[in-house]
């Protein structure tokens, strides 16, 4: 791609209207966690900035992150790849292969040195000179380091890239590790998850593409807008936790009624992610909503914290029946469950009122 176009020019080329372009910019602004005041800046950047060149490398992994990426709904992955970035190299998404494909990688690195965004999916294999993960006939470690040297910014997609992934589980026979110790001082944003949420992946690359800088990061190099809250804090089952109402096994009445999964091993109280906010498949669902406890897949070394159904050590203070009203307010649309909870609440109120009445009579005797 000799003459790179702007995002606006690509919209025009595809016959899309100005209205569609503005709507896309508004959606991107929201996705990136920016205020409505930033819409004009996003529009301006999308109008004039050339599409960013992106190189996507695959290390020791399962391509699950790519599979997640192509399911992004806002923006659509197809729109992103065809109209919003210039994806020059990707093992999974590119049509080319073989020696010409590898030659194109090296040509792109030289042509856009210091300008391209490098996305890395997968771990680095360190044992036996990296022979357990080969790419283009070479150890992936060598290719990754060469390409990383010329990158403007690096995105570590998935828990394999950020901390080694499943293949790093004890005893880690391949010596798999995250990429950060091998990329030098190049700015890097970590996007953990097994896999990450699709819109988190697209949101991060678009932030760098439009503003030329990494998004605000936390102490672990993760974008704050997507990893600023615990799964526990945004969970729709949280009122049950506060009320002390827990499923004891996967087929009891509590589980069927949607009670808290803490006692079944849920890692939500210690896991930072946007699962409860963004969810998956256009906001349809996420593991906890499907009845499975969070396994903490954005946490480093989560794969060794097994069994996943084992309860975490005591966390905070559970609620009591007096707090059940909180659950009622949050679960007003859950039909039978809300009715059952409301009944308990009313009984508690009656008992409390009766106790207060008896106490008052005693004081007046």
What feature does the model see in each segment?
Residues 278-287, 308-319:
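Short cysteine/histidine-rich metal-coordination sites, predominantly Zn2+-binding motifs
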Residues 46-51, 59, 66, 77-193, ...:
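Metabolite-binding pocket within alpha/beta catalytic cores that recognizes anionic/polar moieties
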Residues 20-42:
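N-terminal export signals
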Residues 316-328:
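Juxtamembrane/start-of-transmembrane alpha-helix segments at the extracytoplasmic/lumenal side
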Residues 1-16:
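N-terminal secretory signal peptides
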Residues 351-365:
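Cytoplasmic C-terminal tails of single-pass
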Residues 201, 206-279:
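A conserved mid-domain beta-alpha-beta active-site/ligand-binding segment of alpha/beta enzyme cores
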Residues 332-346:
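Alpha-helical transmembrane segments
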């Amino acid at each position: 791609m000799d003459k790179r176009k702007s995002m606006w020019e690509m919209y025009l080329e595809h016959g899309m209207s100005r209205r569609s372009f503005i709507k896309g910019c508004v959606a991107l602004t929201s996705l990136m966690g920016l205020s409505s005041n930033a819409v004009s800046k996003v529009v301006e950047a999308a109008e004039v900035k050339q599409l960013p060149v992106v190189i996507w490398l695959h290390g020791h992994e399962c391509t699950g992150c790519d599979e997640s990426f192509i399911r992004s709904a806002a923006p659509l992955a197809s729109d992103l790849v065809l109209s919003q970035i210039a994806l020059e190299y990707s093992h999974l998404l590119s049509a080319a292969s073989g020696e010409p494909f590898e030659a194109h990688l090296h040509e792109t690195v030289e042509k856009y040195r210091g300008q391209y965004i490098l996305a890395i999916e997968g771990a680095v294999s360190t044992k036996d000179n990296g022979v357990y993960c080969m790419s283009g006939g070479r150890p992936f470690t060598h290719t990754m380091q060469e390409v990383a040297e010329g990158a403007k910014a690096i995105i570590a997609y998935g828990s394999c890239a950020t901390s080694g992934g499943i293949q790093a589980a004890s005893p880690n026979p391949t010596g798999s590790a995250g990429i950060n110790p091998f990329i030098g001082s190049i700015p890097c944003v970590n996007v953990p998850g097994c896999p990450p949420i699709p819109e988190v992946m697209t949101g991060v690359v678009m932030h760098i593409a439009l503003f030329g800088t990494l998004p605000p990061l936390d102490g672990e190099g993760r974008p704050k807008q997507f990893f600023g809250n615990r799964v526990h804090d945004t969970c729709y089952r949280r009122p049950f936790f506060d009320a002390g109402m827990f499923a004891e096994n996967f087929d009891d009445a509590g589980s069927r009624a949607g009670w808290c999964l803490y006692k079944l091993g849920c890692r939500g109280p210690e896991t930072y992610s946007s699962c409860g906010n963004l969810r998956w498949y256009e906001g349809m669902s996420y593991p906890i909503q499907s009845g499975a406890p969070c396994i903490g897949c954005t946490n480093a070394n989560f794969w060794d914290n097994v069994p996943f159904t084992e309860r975490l050590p005591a966390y905070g203070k559970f609620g009591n029946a007096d707090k059940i009203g909180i659950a009622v307010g949050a679960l007003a649309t859950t039909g039978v469950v809300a009715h059952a909870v409301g009944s308990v609440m009313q009984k508690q109120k009656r008992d409390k009122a009766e106790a207060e009445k008896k106490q008052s009579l005693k004081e007046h005797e």
